[in-house]
Amino acid sequence: MTLAQVLPGTTLPLPEEAADNAFSVLTPIFAVSGGGLLLSQLTEMTGLSPTTIQNWVKRGWVSKPVNKKYGELQVARILLINLLRPAMQLDKIAALLSYVNGSVEDRSDDIIPEPALYNMVCAGLFAMERERTIHHEFVITLIGAQLEGYEGPVLGAKERLSDALAVMLLNIAAATLMQQADAIYEQMCPMR
């Protein structure tokens, strides 16, 4: 499995030090942007169209921007959706994220902040790439190690998070394999 050399879900270059805390790459951007990113900045960073992001907000998959700015929680959620959408239907992605963190507008029902979830997904992807495996057993072992010591705010939170991470990592791996298969196909049967 080979991931592009960009920060997952973005068009930004991937620094080597991002392996354990991928979302920290965005900290300087938030520091100079006055508490959030404008839609134009977010579209440039993700490669998504403005209407796509606005549609996700309209559908309730991402909380509304505050003063036209998207904060860290919103950006992390957008990056997660962007990562998952090549191999998963958008309504299933929304349901999966709700399974983890409940209502997008209510932080009190979250079992993990979205930036931390994004970091866990990225760390899992980097480990899968490093070990060159996408076996389900490896993914489960990896998630178990990631969640060691995690105490969720509600009963069953650790199991919910573990299940959701497995679905996310395997879907992203599937998307990567689909891209590789498409590239091979294009070499075999180029468009005429």
Where are these regions (language model features)?
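Basic helix-turn-helix/winged-helix DNA-binding cores
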Residues: M1-N101
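Intrinsically disordered, low-complexity, charge-dense segments enriched in Lys/Arg
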Residues: G102-R192
